[in-house]
Amino acid sequence: MWRVCARRARSAVPRDGFRARWAALKEGPGAPCGSPRIGPAAVRCGSGIPRYGVRSLCGWSSGSGTVPRNRLLRQLLGSPSRRSYSLPPHQKVPLPSLSPTMQAGTIARWEKKEGEKISEGDLIAEVETDKATVGFESLEECYMAKILVPEGTRDVPVGSIICITVEKPQDIEAFKNYTLDLAAAAAPQAAPAAAPAPAAAPAAPSASAPGSSYPTHMQIVLPALSPTMTMGTVQRWEKKVGEKLSEGDLLAEIETDKATIGFEVQEEGYLAKILVPEGTRDVPLGAPLCIIVEKQEDIAAFADYRPTEVTSLKPQAAPPAPPPVAAVPPTPQPVAPTPSAAPAGPKGRVFVSPLAKKLAAEKGIDLTQVKGTGPEGRIIKKDIDSFVPSKAAPAAAAAMAPPGPRVAPAPAGVFTDIPISNIRRVIAQRLMQSKQTIPHYYLSVDVNMGEVLLVRKELNKMLEGKGKISVNDFIIKASALACLKVPEANSSWMDTVIRQNHVVDVSVAVSTPAGLITPIVFNAHIKGLETIASDVVSLASKAREGKLQPHEFQGGTFTISNLGMFGIKNFSAIINPPQACILAIGASEDKLIPADNEKGFDVASVMSVTLSCDHRVVDGAVGAQWLAEFKKYLEKPITMLL
């Protein structure tokens, strides 16, 4: 129903290097019922089929009286989640939506075989989507028990179960002859009886069953507008309730984790109800945004339409001012009893859900001190939220000492709490990931820029009135050519392989009011300086205005960050994963250098650059070789023509 505003976008996901993390559906005795993500909406296993999420993917509602024609929709509506009590605990891995427009995919290659151990972060398979071939990796340790979709299978619907994984190697044998039909036959027969609702508990149609008594309508949900997007902010609605919508009209502007993207209409209709008001932050993927109807007379029927899923979504209020400081001395807080440690599996492994593991890492919690309340003692999100660290013994003695002088909190009005935007949050997450997982090392060199400045001056005279070529344009061109000479620097770490790219797409760091973003100069190795200059000016302008489209900043094979214009002599930049290198450019300054003349010296404009390398991909000697090629191209710019 919806698409990103740029119709000419080549791709909504990175062309290389993007990995999708799989969401698995826990099954078996005592297994928790998770929420696998299928497209932009989450399927809640506990309630069978969601009341709005999957239907809204096709613009279909139960109140319309129509039958869903979409193949994936029929499959999901006809095959509610069941538990296989005759089998050991296991995980059904569905095919997720790896791009906003993906409906089916092709299993290009399985990277793991049946019986093999899968570690956290291991690549399981490569899936060909409607945009690119995307790596598919594991979030936790397990074993491959059964592959249900063989290599080369085409048009696998999103949401189809593609493999089975187990936690224990001894459980693999139980799935030797496993098929989805066999699992369905083993399901308890009493489960379907839970479908009819009790007559004694009627619910308002607007709350529990939106769409059950309404005219034909389309419920629009928030889709994934970037590969890493998990939620978004509704910045502005461009249409009001009751207004007519024509094909191509801009409906709203959504702030994702990357940029602010226009959200436009593909079909004519009328906006009947806005479910998420302007300014609402952290709207999860799949949440209903609005209701659209085909007939104007149907608008009034949705005046009180309120699905329960969005009742908690409200515009974020400003942070409250600190309360006044009380003169009453603080009362001692009781010390919570030390929780027993979580049960450890083989070799001391602690069983923990991926979400709980992530939250524990963010809060600095030692998982061995947390008591798990999930199935078989597994640590879940609730355990992390309720965890209270144990107090050390000396703390009790310290409490007996007279209280020291208290530091008064800062009075109200002396600070400002700035809400964290989605872009800033993602920048923080990716930079932290880079520093924690990539072994950085740094190489620096000085480059004589005298020849480049002379050539630039002559070229700008020739281009007078048509634009100007900057020193940074020479740097982009020289970097791209050096990547062709030393392709190891134009590579990506893919966990199981090192992907060496055959084209050079240079990401250029641009500072914007919303945060740092890296628009891409595609095929920089074959573009001339004039074209590169034009691309950079256009991309930088769109970045600062927040008008970049996803394909203009997602991907890239090599990054350049230039702080020379701010007078910074040299610095070390953080690698942009999955790339292997980033080049930090400092300011040029005049220095005395030896020269074969009467004075014995000369004054040269020297620029300092630092190359940050991923040591898993680029060894020190290779990084030095790249810098030598880069320096040669800039000190003798005529060699760029060779």
From Swiss-Prot:
Compartmental location: Mitochondrion matrix
Q: Which GO terms describe its molecular function?
A: acetyltransferase activity; dihydrolipoyllysine-residue acetyltransferase activity; identical protein binding; pyruvate dehydrogenase (NAD+) activity
Q: Tell me where in this chain the Lipoyl-binding domain is found.
A: 90-166, 217-293
- Keywords recorded for this protein, A-Z: Acetylation, Acyltransferase, Carbohydrate metabolism, Glucose metabolism, Lipoyl, Mitochondrion, Phosphoprotein, Repeat, Transferase, Transit peptide, Tricarboxylic acid cycle
- Catalytic activity of the protein: N(6)-[(R)-dihydrolipoyl]-L-lysyl-[protein] + acetyl-CoA = N(6)-[(R)-S(8)-acetyldihydrolipoyl]-L-lysyl-[protein] + CoA
Residues binding CoA, per UniProt: R456, S470, S561, N562, G586
Query: Which leading EC class covers this enzyme?
Result: transferase
Kindly provide the PTM information from the record.
Delipoylated at Lys-131 and Lys-258 by SIRT4, delipoylation decreases the PHD complex activity.
Q: Where is the transit peptide?
A: 1-85
Report the EC code(s) recorded for this entry.
2.3.1.12
Annotated protein name in UniProt? Dihydrolipoyllysine-residue acetyltransferase component of pyruvate dehydrogenase complex, mitochondrial
